Amino acid sequence: MKDLIGREISAVAFVRDYVEFHFDGPVLRSRVDPQVAVGEAVYCFPKPGSRDALCLVIGTTVQSLNLDDSRHLEFTTSNGCRVRLPLGAGGVLNFRADQVLQVG
């Protein structure tokens, strides 16, 4: 997972019931609604404004990544956005640089 630090987020994809963060190869998939903090404002997907806020991370790099008590995966981007991915019940984390990391 720490392999994502320093990587550029090349795309954010909204797919039916999940959101994907693409890193020119690796993909971070959130099956539980992500949150993004832009300054003091917090947007919860799929509420109004959340898609625009999530798109702000496209073209930025991951500066830090934290897994807190196995309940949330959070990363901060080079433009100061903080993305928080809740880990759903039974969520599994698997990561290889050439595969998909699925959260929730």
Go through the PLM ranges and name each one.
Residues 1-104:
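Surface-exposed, interaction-prone regions used to assemble/regulate multi-protein complexes
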